[in-house]
Amino acid sequence: MPAVKVKDNEPFDIALRRFKRSCEKAGVLAEVRRRECYEKPTTLRKRAAAAAVKRHAKKVSREQKKFQRLY
């Protein structure tokens, strides 16, 4: 859990903004959303496989664009 120490004479808004930023960096909200409800192991595997396919397609697309002739 991220913690923020409020400095002397620091406005609450700025401290809250720093706390939100530290929570975002730590990935707290993403983790909460992921654990919000139970997801079956088969669904997790399907999601991981779909992400791998998407990453591969993106990589191939970038490689095709790199070797594309520009004439």
Swiss-Prot record:
One Gene Ontology biological process: translation
Domain of life of the organism encoding this protein: Bacteria
PROSITE patterns named among the record's database cross-references: RIBOSOMAL_S21
Cellular component per GO, a single term: ribonucleoprotein complex
Single annotated GO MF: structural constituent of ribosome
Protein family membership: Belongs to the bacterial ribosomal protein bS21 family.
Protein name as it appears in the record: Small ribosomal subunit protein bS21
Organism: Marinomonas sp. (strain MWYL1)
Gene that produces this protein: rpsU
